[in-house]
Amino acid sequence: MQAITVLNPDELGQDPAVGMDLALALGVRHLEIRTAYGSNALVLDDEQVRRVRQLADERGLRVAALASPLWKWCSPEATPGRVDSFGFPTQVHAGDRERWVERAITVAGLLGTERVRVFSHLSVGEQTESLRDDPLLPYALKAAERAGVQLLLENEPVCTIAEPASLLDVLQAHPGLGLWLDLGNLFEVGQGTVEAVEALAPYTEYVHIKDYRPRDDGMKDFVAAGTGAVPYRELLPALHRARPGLPYALETHVRATPGEALTLGAEFLRATVPGGLA
């Protein structure tokens, strides 16, 4: 089964048409939507979301996933650290969260995708909340199932669940939940191994690809996939063997030359995933 390549148009800016045109030029037929027109996708009004879908349809592109910010939040009483939430608040009242879940499911429907990303609460010391025991999660999973959507948990280091053991714990506790596996994040927490990938593969429904070179000051220099420290040449074949046919989404974070990074990343993926990518 051949895997697919996914491109996020907002890597090239807030006019989604620009990124979609690059996708076409690269032979990429699937999109991930996170932000557009200066707003998080969940904050866009229905007409703006429909416009994104129309632009994709006009080019023969399909939205593979909605990269929502659900659960990348904490309570208003907590103080989050520096977090990139892509235009969405990091402090959300408990009473508002159900509405955001419903909005994400609605946006996914408007975009025509069945995959919606979620996180696991920001880590904020003693005020950190638990996703595994969050009563909102069973509600969200049932609402998603009714809508024909699957919620996929990303392993995010600034959130509570980033390592294989904790990922497996919550995925097994909530069978409707899938995994949005970020291999760069897995490497960041010291778990970028073939063994970890093989353990997580049965739950994986979507894959994020980004690469970087660690700096002496603890920061990262993001680079095109295949040119950094993440051991993709070992991880990608192992994941494909265990779980063929997955979507692989390029998330470069390369600010200066995003088009070049996406082009090189797409070439690398096609050369490294056995059988190539569509």
Feature map (PLM): residue ranges:
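Active-site acidic/histidine proton-transfer and metal-coordination neighborhood
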Residues: G13-A17, D21-L22, E58, W73-G178
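Short beta-strand segments at enzyme active-site cores
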Residues: E32-I33, A64-S68, T113-S120, L151-E154, ...
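Glycine-rich, proline-tolerant flexible connector loops at the mouths of alpha/beta enzymes
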Residues: I33-A56, H121-V124
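Glycine-/proline-rich flexible loop or hinge segments
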Residues: R34-G38, S85-G87, E251
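Flexible loop residues that form catalytic
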Residues: A36, W71, H121, Y212, ...
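Flexible, glycine- and charge-enriched loops at secondary-structure boundaries
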Residues: L42-V49, G87-A94, E126-D133, T193, ...
